[in-house]
Amino acid sequence: NGTQHLFEEDPSVFYVSTHQYPHYPGTGSYSETGIGAGKGATLNCPMDVGANNDTYTEVFTEKILPAVELFKPDIILISAGFDAHQADPLGGINLTTEHYAWMTQRLMECADRHCNGRILSVLEGGYDLDALALSVASHIKTLKHFDNVI
């Protein structure tokens, strides 16, 4: 929610978030699309408890990727939170390690098309240390274009 609020009035930054909703702190509904000049530059994709790989694939394919294609970013910044992993004790989302690699690959393809592959990832959440380690490794291997993603 801090990143969303930082850029919600800036039309030069397209902010996208997938997250469990409702969940603390209660922000991130579909209706939050930006403020003022930034209206329309925020895409929240709230997920119900129990959302899984199929749910995320659908949202990525039907909402996120088309929106990113329209925006044509100069760089893609990933706030890589792994607390949606099925083993994470704090959330209710059921993503697998492999699906993090799938999402990373889709974003890399967008970066290749629109910003000469410029992509930056920073680590955010993830509270099951084994799942976090595997997911981060999978994400980094994908970013490095390794063929043998976990």
PLM regions and their residue ranges:
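A general "terminal functional-core" signal
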Residues: N1-I150
